[in-house]
Amino acid sequence: MTATPGLRFPLGATPLAAGTNFAVASSVAEGLELCLFDAAGEKARIPFLDVDAGVWHAFVPDVGPGQAYGLRATGPYRPADGIRCNPAKLLLDPYARAIHGDVTFGPEVLGYDPDRPDAPSSLDSASHVPRSLVVDPAFDWGTDVPRHRRLADSIVYELHVKGFTMAHPDVPPELRGTYAGLAHEAATSHLVDLGVTAVELLPVHRSVPEAFLVERGLTNYWGYNTIGFFAPHEGYSAAARAGDPLGAVREFKAMVLALHQAG
């Protein structure tokens, strides 16, 4: 599988008619590789051959929504300067719209050699970290438009998607703790009855629990340990729980639409 130069904007993975454009910003990498995965593991490794103004870009034919991918960077390793290029480590796309999988904590995910902290680790991390996913951005928003409500006329309610929906008795049990639960009429009607005009959600972007919590069989309830700001957290998606990782994106958008329709 080979790539053509592609475009340096927009950043991230953009599916097009005949393939997907990948654009990744790095001002320090001397080389960047795109790794494609299937259920059996890594199936292809494609070098980015073009870089403009610090953005590496490539168009890969016959790659579409749902494709799992990661990145590997070669270049300087100078931890004291905050530079840690290490091709043994599979990286997430910082602009990924979906991220699937969990971190398996161990020496493989460390960028450094535990026996020589100033040296890079040679252990491959691919089987221990999540993958980025190519996402189709299409969604039917209907006639939805921004409300442009004055702040003086607004009542903003801060809520936690899981906590709010888990505690609501009229949200169906199978939807509690999810975006679909917050989109349910029982949840939106409750907010309207309170006079709420906007919700401010506690972290809904993709996060992972810290290692010390995992060791204790716990998780991070609040979600501030972010690994991807543009990808919705899978753990709050009924669709992802049912085995559809891309469904988390659609479910999140449907939640936003339902909240807007409720006023």
What annotation goes with each model-predicted range?
Residues 1-16, 42-43, 51-55, 62-158, ...:
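The feature marks proteins involved in alpha-glucan
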Residues 171-181, 211-261:
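Aromatic- and acidic-residue-enriched carbohydrate-binding clefts of CAZyme catalytic domains
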Residues 191-218:
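Carboxylate/His-rich catalytic cores and anion/metal-binding grooves
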